[in-house]
């Protein structure tokens, strides 16, 4: 099930200001390029159970159906009031949106600054709908670069330096909380072997969820595609984002005059992104007459729009929704991995069946360092005792 992509409750920064913000973010993250610095998951394949979940420690959380954003908290000089804290949301298109009426204190009582958090903006399912920003990673906190640290450490900063001070501040200042354009909280993270708890939480979540995200516990934060962030979806919900182009039928009347019939159902070609070579055709979108009528009724531009598609039981690509938060289709290798997940799916039962072994191997991995520490401590004590005996 897919929901409505939420709109960002803020004003987009103009090009000149956005460029400077990109420079500031790149400097903070020590990155040479000004592109979107967020990590992107890969589709969960059957091999990932044995090659990843059995061999490495992973956290798992629900995959929210919303708008992926980075939150950037910094300081800007106001000519009237002097330096003040400002907050931006950064989209996957690397657009910066100024978010008014928010304030983030840090754990030393001072306003937070030079901080970048990874998260998702979601809408609640029930009316009246409200916005929530769900945080799940931290790239930088109060000028401290965290991308090279393991997930455990990054989550520690996210909770101790961002989430907890904010909770206390809003508890003491409820009138400020009412002005926030969205609530802010940390996503619930579970050890991978507790995946059953995450599945059990789905019916109780206030927002739509469409899968799971597994993130490696001892892995650094990687900008771009990260092979150690695994996105799992049910087979019938695995989707691909294509760029669609339309070819309308041409009719010729008895007088030999021809015209394009823009009311008739067109042939719709689905394109994937290849990088330097741009977009190339990958397949066709199947639409029923009713679906075409519904699209026409939107009275919106349709040509060269990014569309999220799923495969039906007849292997046809079907329309799910438009993704206006994206300018490009999925990269060709991403599409191929999603196709692999569709053709050789990992079911919920497969993950639940694997959980006991994931736990067994997790415990074994984490028991080894403690055993080695005990051996070292025992050896040290023995050496110290020998020295005392000789004295």
UniProtKB/Swiss-Prot annotation:
Secretion signal span: none
Residue positions of the active site: 63 (n6-gmp-lysine intermediate)
UniProt keywords, alphabetically: GTP-binding, mRNA capping, mRNA processing, Nucleotide-binding, Nucleotidyltransferase, Nucleus, Transferase
Compartments (UniProt record): Nucleus
Transmembrane stretches, start-end: none
Taxonomic superkingdom: Eukaryota
A cellular component annotation (GO) from this entry: mRNA capping enzyme complex
InterPro entries xrefs: mRNA_cap_enzyme_adenylation, mRNA_cap_enzyme_alpha, mRNA_cap_enzyme_C, mRNA_Capping_Enz/RNA_Phosphat, NA-bd_OB-fold
GO MF entries: ATP binding; GTP binding; mRNA guanylyltransferase activity; RNA polymerase II C-terminal domain binding
Broad class of enzyme this protein falls into: transferase
The protein's Enzyme Commission number: 2.7.7.50
UniProt xrefs under CDD domains: Adenylation_mRNA_capping
Annotated segments matching region Disordered: 363-391
GO biological process, one term: 7-methylguanosine mRNA capping
Chief place of localization: nucleus
Catalytic reactions on record: a 5'-end diphospho-ribonucleoside in mRNA + GTP + H(+) = a 5'-end (5'-triphosphoguanosine)-ribonucleoside in mRNA + diphosphate
Entry-linked SUPFAM superfamilies: DNA ligase/mRNA capping enzyme, catalytic domain (SSF56091), Nucleic acid-binding proteins (SSF50249)
Function text: Second step of mRNA capping. Transfer of the GMP moiety of GTP to the 5'-end of RNA via an enzyme-GMP covalent reaction intermediate.
Similarity remark: Belongs to the eukaryotic GTase family.
Subunit structure, as described in the record: Heterodimer. The mRNA-capping enzyme is composed of two separate chains alpha and beta, respectively a mRNA guanylyltransferase and an mRNA 5'-triphosphate monophosphatase.
Protein's UniProt name: mRNA-capping enzyme subunit alpha
Organism, scientific name: Yarrowia lipolytica (strain CLIB 122 / E 150) (Yeast)
